[in-house]
Amino acid sequence: MFTLLITGTDTDAGKTVLTTALAAYWRTYFPSQSVALLKPLQSGVGDRELYRELFALNQPPEEINPLYFQAPLAPPLAAELEQRSIDLSLPWQTLVKLRQSYDRVLVEGVGGLGSPITWELTVADLARDWGLATLLVVPVKLGAIGQAVANVALARQAGVNLKGIVLNCVQPRSETEIAQWAPADLITNLTQIPVLGVLPYLGDRTNLAQLAAAAAQLDLEAFLSA
């Protein structure tokens, strides 16, 4: 059984793209291995609906996303608007159940690694407390190097088991832009965390074949054997 948390440097770093790409990859190339998707907390409409549309999951909505809040805000603020508390035991119990039933469980975090999930805890704290191997998505843009270094420092401070970095083209990028804005060798040298590759810009993020092909270009073998 394999469990992986996908987090990012920020809200729009590309967590959902990487999560769906990995799910498409394993379902395409390893069809005998079952894959479950989990979004422990969600604020606003988004990932759980996309997951069900893309993969025709047998998982009920409350299993994909145990804690849902209507307002597209940080979870503690969204929960406050609804006069609700955030009980992390519910998504934890869901994760335990999924681990018992599926070969692979992909967990998508909310916001960025430093984003709050309660008034006291961040995504980094959740990754540590749940003992999750973690991938960090860094968008390819000016400032990507500094974002990567800062988030890896946060991961180390929090005790996160950070396994790798994936660079993601949130907009069409040339090879020159990628090399100058998010040089993999420099990021690896500064963080001592391997960069597993670059996800290209995907205009159609519902094309399973394209998603699987994009994930296939990542150095997943090195990551899985680490």
Curated annotation (Swiss-Prot):
It is an enzyme of class 6 (ligase). It comes from the Bacteria. One of its GO terms (molecular function) is ATP binding. Its cofactor is Mg(2+). Mg(2+) binds at T16, D47, E108. Its EC number is 6.3.3.3. GO terms for biological process: biotin biosynthetic process. It catalyses: (7R,8S)-7,8-diammoniononanoate + CO2 + ATP = (4R,5S)-dethiobiotin + ADP + phosphate + 3 H(+); (7R,8S)-8-amino-7-(carboxyamino)nonanoate + ATP = (4R,5S)-dethiobiotin + ADP + phosphate + H(+). CDD domains: DTBS (cd03109). GO terms for cellular component: cytosol. It is found in: Cytoplasm. ATP binds at residues 12-17, 47, 108-111, 168-169, 200-202, 207. The keyword ATP-binding applies. SUPFAM superfamilies: P-loop containing nucleoside triphosphate hydrolases (SSF52540). Pathway: Cofactor biosynthesis; biotin biosynthesis; biotin from 7,8-diaminononanoate: step 1/2. Pfam families: AAA_26. Substrate binds at S43. The keyword Nucleotide-binding applies. Its main location: cytoplasm. Keywords: ATP-binding, Biotin biosynthesis, Cytoplasm, Ligase, Magnesium, Metal-binding, Nucleotide-binding. Homodimer. Belongs to the dethiobiotin synthetase family. Catalyzes a mechanistically unusual reaction, the ATP-dependent insertion of CO2 between the N7 and N8 nitrogen atoms of 7,8-diaminopelargonic acid (DAPA, also called 7,8-diammoniononanoate) to form a ureido ring. This cyanobacterium does not encode bioA (which catalyzes the formation of the precursor for this reaction in the cannonical pathway), instead it encodes bioU, which replaces bioA and also performs the first half of the cannonical BioD reaction. Thus in this organism BioD has a different substrate. This is ATP-dependent dethiobiotin synthetase BioD.
